[in-house]
Structure formats: structure tokens, C-alpha cells
């Protein structure tokens, strides 16, 4: 597989089922938030899962390894990241379980159809667009800042795509909790469970998961 890596890419061991993922340090590599979200999300046998803003496909791969879900789809707007995700899926021989789609989150309900998914996961950009960006068009800026989509876009499209009784899982930062709850209320998604994550016992929580 290393012969198929493009310049600047590396193959990282995911420490589960022998799966590996292609990443590029020059772009945006997954962090602990994606791992935490994969542990927080509950996927039942036979369910279909959509990951919005999948990046290099870390969440579909981890959820395929950890759960008995029927099928996993990752939506990613950046073509280079989507290409790495596709190659990681092939490398792990997960083509029958995982699809990677290149597309815009703002058009997700048009791409997949309303009421089509049992579960939606997302590890979205945390920062409001325009704050502290050296280059707003860089891959890292797009992953970290709301350049191409907003929190409201993600929640609105998720509400449209979920089946009745479906579940929405998101990891985000505590400082935007009020916005998250407001957007979920407007989209008629009712928060049921929240987990605060403390980096150290004597520190404030720096991220949270919401369903």
C-alpha cells in the first residue's frame, strides 16, 4: 500500500482490527475528538450511518470496526481529503460497508434524500469563519473554521436527512453550547444526552459530545 501513497502522505495504524488510514500532515489529520465521537455514537445492527464532513474517513472506518451498522457513508467537500478517504476504504477492504461521497454539506439532503439515514455523526469546524485565519482557502482552515458551512447548515441538513426516531451525534466546543442548543431547537432536534470531556481533572471541559 505504501507504494500507492502520494507525496507527503503517510499510513497511520488505527489500533483496531488492523485498520489503517491515509493522512497528510500538510492538510488536516484527525485528532482525539474523532476517536471520542466514535465511542459516544451508538449504532445498532442494520442501521445506515452518514458522517458529515468526514475528512479522510476516520469516523466511518472506526464505526465500521466498532459497531454492527449495515452501511456507512462519508460526505466530504474537499476532493483531496475525499480521495484519501476512498483509498483508505479500499486499503482496508471496506468497499461493501463504506462509501465516500464528494459534496457540499449544505446540499446533503438533496444528495441523500430526506429521511434516509438512521444515524448522523459530525465533527464539524469549531471556529466561526474569519477568526484568526491566515489563509481561509487552506485545507486546515476549512476543517477548523466555518468557511464552507455553518453550524446551522449542519444541524438543519441533519434534521432533514434523519429518519423519524433517528439519532444525531456531534462533538463540539463548550463555548458554542448556546448556539448548538438553539440551532437544534429550531431544527426540531431534541438534545437527549451530553458528555463533557475534561483534558485534566483540574481543568475546564474543552469539548463535548451531544446527541
Where are these regions (language model features)?
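Glycine-rich, phosphate-binding/catalytic loops in enzymes
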Residues: 38, 136-139, 186-187
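Mobile active-site "lid"/loop adjacent to the S-adenosyl-L-methionine
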Residues: 124-153
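Conserved Class I SAM-dependent methyltransferase catalytic core
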Residues: 148-205
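Conserved small/polar residues in nucleotide/adenosyl-binding loops
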Residues: 210-211
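General small-molecule cofactor/ligand-binding pocket signal
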Residues: 22, 99-101, 192-195
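Class I SAM-dependent transferase core
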Residues: 2-45
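Conserved SAM/SAH cofactor-binding pocket of Class I
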Residues: 40-122, 127-133
